[in-house]
Amino acid sequence: METIAKHRHARSSAQKVRLVADLIRGKKVSQALETLTYTNKKAAGLVKKVLESAIANAEHNDGADIDDLKVTKIFVDEGPTMKRIMPRAKGRADRILKRSSHITVVVSDR
């Protein structure tokens, strides 16, 4: 049984979150949680929270056994980008792009 959890509008760029997502794809859930716990990146905390939510969804909604679960799919899509202006010297201005992402984790007991 596949179970999904999503975090939409996560305040980190998709490029940065994908680095962390690639670390846990295909691993057992317990091993993935341990990997994320010791990964020193902001995105690791975001992905860990979504993974824990997927585990809880599988246990509560589908009655799955946690020991059998694996991360079957994990993907990160780009979310909306907030555009901001940073004043610079001599009356100029630069555009700052504050990127966001949509994190999706799918766990399965197969």
From Swiss-Prot:
Keywords (A to Z) from UniProt: Ribonucleoprotein, Ribosomal protein, RNA-binding, rRNA-binding
CDD domains for this protein: Ribosomal_L22
GO cellular component, one term: cytosolic large ribosomal subunit
PROSITE patterns, alphabetized: RIBOSOMAL_L22
Role noted for this protein: This protein binds specifically to 23S rRNA; its binding is stimulated by other ribosomal proteins, e.g. L4, L17, and L20. It is important during the early stages of 50S assembly. It makes multiple contacts with different domains of the 23S rRNA in the assembled 50S subunit and ribosome.
Organism expressing this protein natively: Photorhabdus laumondii subsp. laumondii (strain DSM 15139 / CIP 105565 / TT01) (Photorhabdus luminescens subsp. laumondii)
GO MF annotation, one: structural constituent of ribosome
Keyword Lyase (UniProt): no
Gene Ontology biological process terms from the UniProt entry: translation
InterPro entries: Ribosomal_uL22, Ribosomal_uL22_bac/chlpt-type, Ribosomal_uL22_bac/org-type, Ribosomal_uL22_CS, Ribosomal_uL22_sf
Protein origin, superkingdom: Bacteria
Name under which the protein is recorded: Large ribosomal subunit protein uL22
Gene3D superfamilies per record: Ribosomal protein L22/L17 (3.90.470.10)
Subunit structure as annotated in this protein's UniProt entry: Part of the 50S ribosomal subunit.
Keyword Coiled coil on entry: no
Similarity field: Belongs to the universal ribosomal protein uL22 family.
HAMAP family in the record: Ribosomal_uL22_B
